[in-house]
Amino acid sequence: MASSSPMFNDHAIARSKYALNSVLQQTNELHDGNGGGGYTPSSPHLGGVSLNKSQNQPYTQYNNGGGGGGGGGGHINPMHLNLNSITNNHNNHHNHHPNTLSTPHNNNHNNNNHSTSHHPHSNSVANGGHLSQSITQQRGGLADLANAVINRKNRSDSVQTKMKPTDSASNIESWAKVEKFSSSIFDSEKSKKSNIFQKYTLRLKNSYEKGYLHQHYNSQIMLLRITNLIGIVAVSYGFTKEAIFMLIAIRILCFNLFAFSIFLSFLRNRELYKKLFHPLFLFSFTTFFITILLEYKTTTTTLILFLYVVIFCCLYALGCLLFIWMVMCNLMNAICFIIFIFLESTLDRNNLISFVIYILTMFLVGASHLYVLEKFRKESFIAEKKLIKESNILKNEKEKSSKLLNNILPDFIIENIVYDFEKRDIVIPEPEEYKSCSILCFDIVQFTNMSAKLDSPSRLVDLLTQVFREFDTVVLRNGCQKIKTDGDAYICACGLKSKKKAKKQMPNSKSTPLLQSTSSTSVNNIDLDKDNKDNNNNNNNNKNSNNNFKNKNNIINNNNNSNSNNNNNNNSNNNNINNSGNDDDDEEIEDSELEHFEKLIDVAIEIMNLDVLKETGNTEGIQVQFRCGIAAGSVYGGVIGSQKYQFDIWGDTIARSHTLEQLGQPGKVHVGETIMTHKNWLKKWQYNYNIVSNSECKDQEHDYEFHKAHGECITSYFVDWKDDYREKKKKDLSCDFSINKVLNAETIESKSNNNNYNNNNYNNNNYNNNYNNNNLNNNSNNNNNEYGSSSSSSSVLGEAVTEQIDCNNTNPPLQHKKSQSILTNNENDIVSPSLTSNSPILDTTVNNNNNNNNTNNNNKNQNNIYGNNNNNEEDFKIKSKSNSSFEIEMSNIKKPKSRFIDRVMGILHHVKISNDKIDKEIIQIDEDFVKVTKLRKYFLFFENLTTEKFFHKYVIINNVVETKFFLVIGLILHLMFYLDDHIMDSAPYFNSNVIYLVMGIAFLVYIGLSFTRIFRTPLVYQIAFFILLCAFGVCTVLELIRFQNPLARSSLTRVCATLFYLNVFHSLNFLSVLFLNLFIFSFFIICSILISPTLTNHLYETDYIGFVIVLLIQICSSYGMKLAMRKAWVVNCKINFKTISVNKEKDKFNFLLKSIFPQSALTKLRDMIDTPNIETKGIVYVQPHQDVSIMFIQIAGFQEYDEPKDLIKKLNDIFSFFDGLLNQKYGGTVEKIKTIGNTYMAVSGLDGSPSFLEKMSDFALDVKAYTNSVAISRVVRIGISHGPLVAGCIGISRAKFDVWGDTANTASRMQSNAQDNEIMVTHSVYERLNKLFYFDDEKEILVKGKGKMVTHVLKGKKDLEQTNKWFTKPPEVWEVNATPAGIASPLSGTLLGEIGSFTTPRFHLSS
């Protein structure tokens, strides 16, 4: 390749008629043996084939011989593409195309289409292949695929407004839990017998039982204390009465037990009481009941019965003991009571039976109530645990998606991506134009020779991994953005600023933003532009103030700043705190391109000097040389296609950058004249950079082909650091890494500790801090050095000002291990006495000649040193036992730590910021859920009536068995009341037999109806059971109204049991239960006063007190139980809601993986996303394959004056069709790798399919047939090869699936040598497929880097049993009659401007 390095004039290009269509810059250009492009710039190309109006190529042999790199992209060197590059010979194209569309657009060409000329050679089978020969049968499939593509082409038309939500909190039906639990929460891993025991004793699995006991204890601790305190009061009251010695001894024992329980509950270490409170409670209340029996054995036994019922009604209702312990307590007291009445009382047999009935009734109703209550409690506990687990899973899935997307696509693309849950598809925003940016392109020199030195593709990939990882670090550190790597090519940019705003989810939308943009500190070029702007503002601000630290990117800019006012720092510092910059807006816009360019120059020079490029710097021991080119201007950027998403850029700027790279020299930074002649260039950069004109440009001044491609030729330049500036930059970098090496370890440790402390929340204040950072409204104008140092600079006036931190004089203690202790928050750490304000690294003052200014500015600079970055800085402020000035100075160390680590290690993968964003998203989900499930706590009613409806459905369905059981209990209770009346021969006031009969029938009817679905309706259930319980209470009161009322206390006991029974129906609304309790209580009082006035004569004050206590406790217990039930349901629904969200997040994640990576790599990549070192090493996945096939498809034939945006849209439609064809017909075997400009790359055989090569050939024929039948204004050139290669992903950012190896290089060369509508294959492919496909005779071509190669042209498939059996050889002539077949071409409107229709091809064999 010629060594001359011409540069084209930007203004000349703008005037050139070829400028519009230069947006598709990336072509399939090959490297020559010296690493140069395989095509001379004198002949513009699209996809490696010259498409000038004149098909005469003076460098044809040179073009065909392009040697090249070995990689999935190294073999494809993205190159420039001007108008000529995408324009075919207009007449030639239409005169030789075998098929035409009968559309108004083509009428001028199709009026005489019956007489269309046809050429018998390569174009004679332009529609060749099995698909073309059977186009009549297969065109429907193509049309279907095209329809699928056309439905997706309008990517900017979000589907949000077309659908209702399926996963939002407002759609209650989607998450409201009404079904029963799928499995019992009491199952264990033990035997079935053990499961039965655990099920009926409500014992959880061992892993949960301990946790529930802990929660139960903490929730009941106050109630236990109050209960024990009441026991102490009751026992103390007994001491006021005379008693026998045994009673006094038991009371003393009971008093001590209650007191000991209270004492244990107030100990700091409550573990002992947590273990003992159940047996202590059981024993203490049993002894207390024994004291009651002994005290009242000489009184009426009915009082003891009443007290027994009151005590256990309260204990069962409160549920302060676990079910099994409460049952044991009741059994022990019941046994003691029964023994007492049989041994000590003088009751007759009927009374004894009556007492036993009441005792059993209390036990039966109480135990069943507590069983259901505890079951709900434990289900709620398990639900809360499951909710935490689901929340963590949801967060992890979101983190995976976030890491994956942010590693592949820029934030301003991610925030506009929408996931359509209904169609299970992703809506990608259309590419947009970025008006002002700079592009830097790298390419390895002599990559073919370098690859030959490595004995395996794996070693090549290892080398590229090491090199590009260092590239990524440099690019990120300088605030730029990596675009992509294509094999040995590396492309980055600065200044990509999206004008699109993130799409927000519509209220009625099934589509949701895939991942919202992270916080404003994330590394995307929106923020980087802000930094650029701030850096530019800083240039002017520094005229009046000396900052402690300068931004690294301002080192160059500050050289020419006037420091004449340096001595006025005392006033100017304060004046500039609230300034937003004094630069004129026009000047900022004008200079923004310079800021981008400056950063990329620093990046390029720094990369050229990396140690990894030296023989001793990489593990392979190979010197790696790069060429690079930098250009500034506008580009189009975005994502095209429907699979294997990748961000790419197109346009004249990238084309010029590639051309500069091609025409450059190894190890030198090559730029054009336009940016160098900018009015501020020399003023800003001449003192720091060596600028050398490329004198060899004159060789190209009279090259017609070059001018035709690129416009006028003007001088280009090589840029490098000056020696003194280079040394200072080295100091800066060494200081950066020496500091950040320590800080990085501390950051990781602090983040790890913080994550271990709380997996769900990220504490932004990891360190306690006494430093009061004033809230200054400093809009980053005083932009400080993000690396903790700056370089001295010379002003135009020759006045030297030193504003640096000398890394060479860094105090040794900072480099010693002990010095790391000052960066931690450990109180035992020792602070080195040498680390004081005199330490150069800790010095925050400006070392100018005015010492007074240093003193005056010190405190002010301490306040404004971080500008408006207060939030980030709080993370790393240090707590110290020393004086406050030391604390402030120590806080200044954190600047390089936070800026560097957050940018390089944190922001890119959003380690902390993304997690905070995900936390906010989850919190937002919770907040939305809370709004829908908002509860009126005083009335226990959901504000949302739909939510209330689903809650009652849930409770009813989950309590079907309990409802039946409690109806049976009610019937038994009613029978016991009847037996009691019958045994006691009571004389009721009303005819009780009729009342008992009616209620008995009612219970039987309800029991029968409970086996139907009639009670499943919430309203029916509420009304029916309200009527039943109201009738039961009224009947019970009427039944116990007797003449003379000899059993007044037993009647009161029966009313207490009735009130208790009203509360066991958990499905009944609280307001209904409250009304029933108050109604029955009032009705009993009214009846006892009005109907049976003598009843009150048999009751005492203690009876009334006990009765009221039972009523209040029942109401409170019912409120608490139903509130807990509602909370438990909300938790279960939240689990259901988050489970749905998790599943959808998994769907999105899996869809993303499938849309970006081949199926064969998904499993390993899923695991890799979770690895800790992905934050520092990125995605590193490499897999060698011994035999796979590679294909390159180049699209050409675009119109001469198409707008760039239209060209990209047309390519998007074509590539989306290819994606759909692969997905529908060849999914799993043939995989898309990527698109490079107008070239589509695919691989076959990664899944190990034995027919991979045949399927690849079928796909090539399908693509060719599609292009010639649907997109007839296009031509394709296809190349196929097969052999070994390495596939995988490498890089810290923008890591995409790619392949490397000579097989890919060979396929690229096949494509570059193919003619229009040809499928060129290697001889090895021919040998494998000659029995299945038709091929042309072999042809020997000269390929640079490979020598002479035997190739073949694939024509069609022999096996046509499904189509035309009469074919015995490939057809030589196609005749197509323009008879409309009525099959619409969905893509024709996009590709040709209007809707067209297929013509019916009729094939005739020529003699």
UniProtKB/Swiss-Prot annotation:
It is an enzyme of class 4 (lyase). Binds 2 magnesium ions per subunit. Residues 1-219, 374-962, 1399-1407 are cytoplasmic. Residues 28-131, 502-590, 751-799, 828-876 are annotated as: Disordered. Keywords: ATP-binding, cAMP biosynthesis, Cell projection, Lyase, Magnesium, Membrane, Metal-binding, Nucleotide-binding, Repeat, Transmembrane, Transmembrane helix. Residues 64-75 have a biased composition (Gly residues). Expressed throughout the structure in the tipped mound and finger. Expressed primarily in the prestalk region of the slug. In the early culminant expression is increased in the posterior prespore and anterior-most regions and expands into the developing stalk. In the mid and late culminant it is expressed throughout the stalk. Mg(2+) 1 binds at residues 443, 488. Its EC number is 4.6.1.1. Residues 80-90, 98-115, 505-526, 535-581, 752-795, 847-871 have a biased composition (Low complexity). Mg(2+) 2 binds at residues 443-444, 488. One of its GO terms (biological process) is regulation of cell shape. CDD domains: CHD (cd07302). Residues 438-661, 1189-1311 form the Guanylate cyclase domain. Regulated by cyclic AMP receptor 1 through a guanine nucleotide binding protein and protein CRAC. Both positively and negatively regulated by extracellular cAMP; this regulation is part of the mechanism that establishes the oscillatory cAMP waves during aggregation. Coordinates cell aggregation by synthesizing the cAMP that influences differentiation and morphogenesis of cells within a developing multicellular structure. This is Adenylate cyclase, aggregation specific. It comes from Dictyostelium discoideum. The lineage of its organism: Eukaryota, Amoebozoa, Evosea, Eumycetozoa, Dictyostelia. The gene is acaA.
